[in-house]
């Protein structure tokens, strides 16, 4: 664990020493999807990943982890998914693009580069940093994991917070009327003139 101190002091001419017990090299990553559908309550689906402390082990999510998160969301929601992702290189990987092309229930759009203010999940992370993670000195990685799960569970049960994260971006969810209109047009329309 890294020390919870942002700053420290010492006498002039002395080097400050901060003693920390239980230093750990374990790493935890979390990916989340904020799910919105007009007329229904929003949902938050997340997946933690506990990284192995071995040399050469991957220190972040792989595209297969994001694929598994999308599959989990598809199974929970029981409907096709339109993912709107930031431009993380793992989101744009060839494996993820191929997976989306092979499955008709998955459509992926990319947010513009350097636009975290358009991503509702950034609002979720902000809620965590300002709430449950603020001014806490975690004793070990398990303490951090328990705190994160509890805080994310509380956010999952507050749809107004998840809605607020979308509202903060300035984006709105509207059904695609052109798709609805195309579906209502007869198959042999327009009539062929001889």
Region annotations inferred by a language model:
Residues 1-68, 173, 179-192:
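Extended, low-complexity cationic-aromatic segments
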Residues 15-22, 104-120:
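RNase H-like polynucleotidyl transferase catalytic core
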Residues 26-28, 79, 104-107:
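Short glycine-/polar-rich loops that comprise or flank the Walker A/P-loop
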Residues 63-82:
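Short, basic/hydrophobic alpha-helical segments
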Residues 83-97, 113-118:
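Acidic, metal-coordinating catalytic cores used for nucleic-acid/nucleotide bond scission
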Residues 98-104:
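Short, surface-exposed basic-aromatic patches at helix termini and helix-loop junctions that form
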Residues 122-194:
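C-terminal anion-handling pockets and recognition modules
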